Amino acid sequence: MEDKLKKAKIIFVVGGPGSGKGTQCEKIVQKYGYTHLSTGDLLRAEVSSGSSRGKMLSSIMEKGELVPLETVLDMLRDAMLAKVDSSNGFLIDGYPREVKQGEEFERKIAQPTLLLYVDAGPETMTQRLLKRGETSGRVDDNEETIKKRLETYYKATEPVISFYDKRGIVRKVNAEGSVDTVFSQVCTYLDSLK
C-alpha cells in the first residue's frame, strides 16, 4: 500500500484566501478524478467523529494551539491510503504551510509531483473575500481580518514556493481571471502529467 502512494500523482495546491483554489480543486476533481484532501476538512471531520483522536484534537483546537504535524500527517496518510486504489491522484489543499511540513510529508508519505500555485493579487483576494463575506456570514471575511490573513499567508508561503521552485516543480497559475480562464491554465499543467 505504502508503495502505491510513492507512485501516485500528488499535487500540493497553494493559494491565498480568496485566490479561488477551492473552486479550482473542485473542477480538477470533476475533470480528472483526483481526490481533494484539505487538512482543515480532515481535522473537522475527525473532531465531529468523536474518536479518541478527535477528542484530543478538539481540546488542542479549543485552546487555539496548533495541531502537531505528526497528527496531521497521520490523518493525511490514512485518507490517502483509503483512496489510493480508486483515485487518479491527490490534491493536497493548503499544505504545506511551511518548508518543514513539506519535508516531513516526503519523509512519511511521498514526494509531490507538482506544486500548483494559484496566484491572485492582494486586491483581488480582498475583493473576493469581502464579497463572500456578504453571503457566507463567515466572521473571518471582514477587511481587517482579511488583511491579517493575507500577511500571514504571504509570510508563510514564500519560503515554501521557493523551496519547491528550486526543484522545478512549481506551476504558477494566474488566478486573476474568470474561473474558466484560470482552469484552462490548470489543465495545461495537469495534462502534461499523463
Swiss-Prot record:
Top-level taxon: Eukaryota
Region (LID), start-end ranges: 131-141
Keywords: Acetylation, ATP-binding, Cytoplasm, Kinase, Nucleotide-binding, Phosphoprotein, Transferase
Catalytic function, reaction form: a ribonucleoside 5'-phosphate + ATP = a ribonucleoside 5'-diphosphate + ADP; AMP + ATP = 2 ADP; dAMP + ATP = dADP + ADP; dATP + AMP = dADP + ADP
Cofactor: Mg(2+)
One BP term from GO: cerebellum development
Phosphoserine found at: 38
Subcellular location field: Cytoplasm
Pfam families referenced in this protein's UniProt entry, alphabetically: ADK
Residues with N-acetylmethionine modification: 1
GO MF term (any one): deoxyadenylate kinase activity
Region (NMP): 38-67
Residues at which AMP binds: 39, 44, 65-67, 94-97, 101, 138, 149
PANTHER family recorded: NUCLEOTIDE KINASE
Assembly behavior: Monomer.
Domain-level remarks: Consists of three domains, a large central CORE domain and two small peripheral domains, NMPbind and LID, which undergo movements during catalysis. The LID domain closes over the site of phosphoryl transfer upon ATP binding. Assembling and dissambling the active center during each catalytic cycle provides an effective means to prevent ATP hydrolysis.
Database matches in NCBIfam families: aden_kin_iso1 (TIGR01360), PRK14527.1 (NF011100)
Full protein name: Adenylate kinase isoenzyme 1
Species the sequence originates in: Rattus norvegicus (Rat)
